[in-house]
Amino acid sequence: MDAPLYPFKPIYSLKALSLTLGESAELLESLAMRSSNLYRYVPQAKKDGPPRDTYDAYQPLKSIQRKIVDRLLARVRFPAYLHGGIKDPLNRRSIYSNAKVHGNAKFVLLQDIKDFFPSIKVQHVQQIFERLFGFSEEVSKLLALLTTRDGVVPQGASSSGYLANLVFWDVEPMLVTRLEAQGLNYSRFADDITISSMTPLDSATLTKLVSAVTRMLAEKGCYQKRSKLHVRRRGQTLKVKVIDEFVPLTVTGLTIFNQVPGIPKAERKAIRAAVKQLEDQAEHGASWIQLEPLARRVMGRIGRLIACAHPDGERLKQRLHALKARSQVALLGRYAAAQPESAFSVE
């Protein structure tokens, strides 16, 4: 059974935890007792709906959470079905690896966990450290307090993504094993769950699959977001209310009804338009200093094309590089023209 595994010696005392993290036990206990007051609210805008509630820890809690990640959480051997926010040089995890699991699928079942991070309670985190890692109750309770805010896992903290991957550590592997025995593929990227089949599925089977996932979520006090539950056959499109258009079905933003995940046509068109907009702004006199913030964001979007091996990726990348070179040369020319002639004379 493919399941999370912590293959190292358990930590039984606060002294041992102190040595592992390189911080005094007194500091760890002090921060744990007041950790809920050591965050700043950093709302993240979404394409639709209200902003996403995210939090960033203040120092020194932030650096201690980073140590908890690097020295404990990141050392877990994560099962292949988990793809979100995991550092694994031997089996790289990303939106691409997640979508690739379902390439060429005939049927896809998409499910979303409602209010995922706030649903992960401090007791769930303590159970992860106590039962999966094998740590003592004292150590597990302290680590749970250091990685939660107001009794729940705060989205945005460096440790939160790892805890989100591990919260179903004792129930998800059994579900995946049963699905694989039926010839189905399963993956989870944070709160996005995808199940796919290479053969048609009848309505009774689909109902059982939804119920099985619902039961797994309920084990940890989580619920499905009913508005994000979708069942699609190969070739079907999905109507997006925001743009009032039908678009191909995607898994973590990538089309999956081919062997290799791809970027939807509408997104490719938008990326090309963004590059053209930058070129037009440069033609009208915008400097690279003015263009750079937008250019960085556009380059990130181009990176998605390159990662999917789409030919537009390299072409658009070269256009941005050429734009940068032209803009910087033009900036130097304007600077030179603005200087008095004596500034460039040599005696």
Spans of model-derived segments:
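Right-hand nucleic-acid polymerase module
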Residues: 1-138, 142-157, 166-169, 173, ...
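Catalytic palm active-site di-aspartate
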Residues: 110-114, 156, 160, 182-200
